[in-house]
């Protein structure tokens, strides 16, 4: 089935008149510099076109932007050989100077910050402060654009305010600046958004096609980032998410398919199977968390499988009774072919700390880019050098 699927994609590609250029985007979480010891210089930037810096926060009292961690953002000495550089943003700026196609986008908000956006859009003064400080941040700290990560507007009034927010940013920001959103995959959240109105002001959409299922809210084991079909717990899949946005008027080239560089763990699972109940019991030797980076799975799992129909992978540890679902290299390659066949804009990952080295055969971004046709088919428009 996997080979048939790949052949189908390739047949559709054969009829395209020109080779499109693709975006490869990845979120960099600023807290990764601590426990994970993951720094900007560790990102294989030859495989990425856009880096999304997560997260910039909003001051609830004023509506102005603020750093979530000023120490690591601006002051923390970088590792060798870049000890003379202080702060992640300065390091990224130096990387941009040497790699003029690399773009850095500030991602504002993130999970658990919806109340901050609600506070901003409900007060005219805060709204003005937000827009003006966003422009100041972009110009001062060397960003190429703004990513709004409002998870999520709760009703049509807030959805209209999000449109207004995007419109005001687009009006004030120089046209060279990129504006994006982290867009939901769940149908309830999608239906609230005013997609066509938002699309007028957006450069592209980052579709969060992951976390379709998880131990904290699912009743059965499931793939959490499957491309097709029922994932085991519900009917969510990435292909349907993409089609929903297309049906609502977004051009495919503006859609960026989001993928995980982490797995979701289900504890208390009797056997390596999707769609079965689990107890959440954490046995000795298990991974305590319900999320783990792709590069931290370890070698305790004694069973691995890949579903070519749904495009999802799993590992299972029969001793600790834990099952993990994730994207493996086959998923990365099939999703790359899917993006080509559907003429989408590219791929996105959360987050950069999760992948294995590009020297490892299982490197997700390298497999993805190689399947697209190599780094030669990646977008190469120039970045902005200002600030910092």
Swiss-Prot record:
Its EC number(s): 3.2.1.14
Gene3D superfamilies to which the protein is assigned, alphabetical: 3.10.50.10, Glycosidases
Q: Where does chitin bind?
A: 82-83, 109-112, 152, 208-211, 350
Which GO molecular function annotations are given, in alphabetical order? chitin binding; chitinase activity; endochitinase activity
Quote the InterPro entries the UniProt record gives.
Answer: Chitinase_II/V-like_cat, Chitinase_insertion_sf, Glyco_hydro18_cat, Glyco_hydro_18_chit_AS, Glycoside_hydrolase_SF, Glycosyl_Hydrlase_18
Task: Give the first-level EC class, as a single word.
Answer: hydrolase
Is the Hydrolase keyword given for this protein? yes
Query: Would you identify the family this protein belongs to, as annotated?
Result: Belongs to the glycosyl hydrolase 18 family. Chitinase class V subfamily.
Task: Report the protein's function.
Answer: Chitinase involved in the remodeling of chitin in the fungal cell wall. Plays a role in sporulation.
Q: What is the protein named?
A: Chitinase 4
Annotated source species: Candida albicans (strain SC5314 / ATCC MYA-2876) (Yeast)
Taxonomy of the source species: Eukaryota, Fungi, Dikarya, Ascomycota, Saccharomycotina
């Amino acid at each position: 089935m996997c080979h048939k699927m790949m052949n189908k994609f390739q047949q559709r590609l054969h009829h395209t008149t020109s080779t499109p250029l693709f975006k490869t985007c990845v979120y960099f979480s600023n807290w990764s510099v601590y426990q994970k010891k993951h720094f900007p210089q560790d990102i294989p930037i030859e495989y990425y076109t856009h880096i999304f810096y997560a997260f910039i926060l909003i001051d609830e009292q004023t509506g102005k932007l603020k750093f979530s961690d000023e120490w690591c953002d601006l002051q923390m000495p970088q590792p060798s050989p870049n000890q003379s550089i202080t702060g992640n943003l300065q390091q990224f700026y130096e990387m941009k100077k040497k790699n003029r196609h690399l773009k850095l986008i500030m991602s504002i908000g993130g999970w658990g910050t919806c109340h901050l956006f609600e506070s901003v859009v409900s007060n005219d003064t805060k709204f003005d402060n937000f827009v003006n400080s966003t422009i100041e941040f972009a110009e001062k700290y060397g960003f190429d654009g703004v990513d709004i990560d409002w998870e999520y507007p709760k009703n049509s009034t807030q959805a209209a305010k999000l449109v207004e927010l995007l419109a005001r940013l687009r009006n004030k920001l120089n046209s060279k600046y990129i504006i994006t959103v982290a867009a939901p995959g769940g149908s309830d959240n999608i239906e609230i958004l005013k997609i066509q109105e938002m699309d007028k002001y957006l450069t592209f959409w980052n579709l969060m096609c992951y976390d379709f299922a998880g131990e904290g809210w699912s009743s059965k084991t499931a793939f959490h980032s499957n491309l097709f079909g029922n994932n085991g717990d519900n009917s969510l899949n990435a292909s349907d998410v993409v089609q929903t946005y297309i049906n609502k008027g977004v051009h495919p080239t503006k859609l960026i398919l989001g993928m995980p560089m982490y797995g979701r763990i289900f504890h208390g699972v009797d056997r390596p199977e999707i769609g079965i109940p689990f107890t959440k019991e954490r046995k000795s030797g298990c991974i305590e968390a319900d999320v783990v980076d792709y590069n931290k799975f370890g070698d305790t799992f004694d069973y691995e499988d890949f579903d070519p129909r749904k495009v999802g992978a799993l590992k299972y540890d029969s001793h600790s009774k834990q099952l993990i679902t994730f994207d493996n290299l086959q998923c990365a390659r099939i999703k790359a072919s899917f993006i080509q066949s559907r003429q989408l804009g590219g791929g996105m990952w959360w987050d950069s700390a999760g992948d294995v080295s590009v020297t490892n055969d299982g490197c997700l971004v390298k497999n993805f880019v190689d399947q697209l046709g190599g780094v030669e088919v990646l977008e190469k428009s120039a970045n902005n050098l200002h600030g910092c």
